[in-house]
From Swiss-Prot:
Disruption phenotype: Deletion mutant is defective in both PHA biosynthesis and cell growth. The number of PHA granules is significantly lower. Keywords: Plasmid. The gene is phaP. Polyhydroxyalkanoate (PHA) granule structural protein. Important for PHA granule formation and separation, and for cell growth. This is PHA granule-associated protein PhaP. It is found in: Cytoplasmic granule.
Amino acid sequence: MSEQANPFTQFFQLQRRSIEQSQRSMHQGIEFQKQVTRMMVDGMKAQQSVSRKGTDFARTAVKSYFEMMDSSVPGDNRMYADVKDAMDEQFDSIDEMTEQTWDVMEESFEENADAMDEIMEQSLEYLDDATEVYLEGLQEIEETSAQVTPDTPE
């Protein structure tokens, strides 16, 4: 027994699969972009930690230097104490400014990452809607072609 088939059926199936695969690829690509954005935010936090440790190291080195000078040079130790106090104040100011800068940067990165997530989600919704409309149109065309195209034996 021979079956009758529309010669365009495979064409429509192939096109439908291709569109669906493209849609999945777009979803994966956008999810990857969202992950990269979050990794950048996390990387910035790691950089903040490294920066803080570098400042702490510099503070410790300067403090140790002045303590060494204070203990090895006879005379008026008040001079070294004043310099150490001034250096501590400078490092405190640097810490405060750096902390404020990192806070502003982190907040900005977070806001931008959230905004990007929203834009990407909206883009995916548009993509899904457009794909659905296209596939529905393709289905209608396939049905119409099935009605007007004579079947051929398989």
